[in-house]
Amino acid sequence: MVGSQVKSWFKNAFTYDTNKQSNTWDECLKADCFFVCLPTLYKENEGYDLSILEETIDNIPDGKLIVIRSTINPGTMDIFQNRYPKKKFMFNPEFLTELSAEEDFKHPDMQILGISKESSGMATEIMLMLPPAPEMRIVSLIDAEWVKKLRNAFYTTKVIFFNQIYDIIEKTELADYETIRSIVVHDPRIGNSHSFIKHKGYRGFGGACLPKDLYSLIDFAKKVGANSELLETVKKINKYLYK
């Protein structure tokens, strides 16, 4: 989802896409900075498939700045920076919805740029190239990775919370969920997003981002020996809601 939005913002940039008309790879190699927007498919208990990402990084010459926007686990960017010490890495997570991806990219609610020691000298320049946002932060690579992971995990939890409240209210047959919802979401600590019961005709959460980010976080927690009971419950409830 991310590549076309980046292309629309950087109108004079070289672009390379094996599935669409684009510049040649040799033309792209003239650039000093590469925004890498590639799919990282996720399989439960196996992790993200980083092969296409790693292949692309291998083909970018030393000394270049590489800004990754693909979805990955916390710690992945530090692994890349250590593996390729002569390249400079940044992580700029996407916060897009499928229905309004281009608008979300051009008018983000936050702009987060994760940097390494090797890329820190270009941090301000790159940040100013990106669409402005009310919250603009330059942080470590791993903190930027966690911001993306936390947001999406919270959204999944919020969806399930509102679905559970809906079911409880419906059982009473006295109160109106939509009236109640439309009032409480005016509390800025709660907000309107992810409070509607049906999305695209189904309950629960689906799509390309939320499920895989939740599942990957649960698997990540298991690997580091952390308790993820709440997240596992969210996953379990969603499996019977999402029909």
Task: Place the predicted regions along the sequence by residue.
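Internal alpha-helical scaffold of NAD(P)-dependent oxidoreductase catalytic cores
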Residues: 12, 81-90, 97-193, 220-227, ...
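Rossmann-like NAD(P)(H) cofactor-binding subdomain of soluble oxidoreductases
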Residues: 33, 41-101
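Alpha-helix C-terminal capping/helix-to-coil transition sites in glycosyltransferase folds
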Residues: 29-30, 62, 107
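Structural motif
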Residues: 33-37, 112
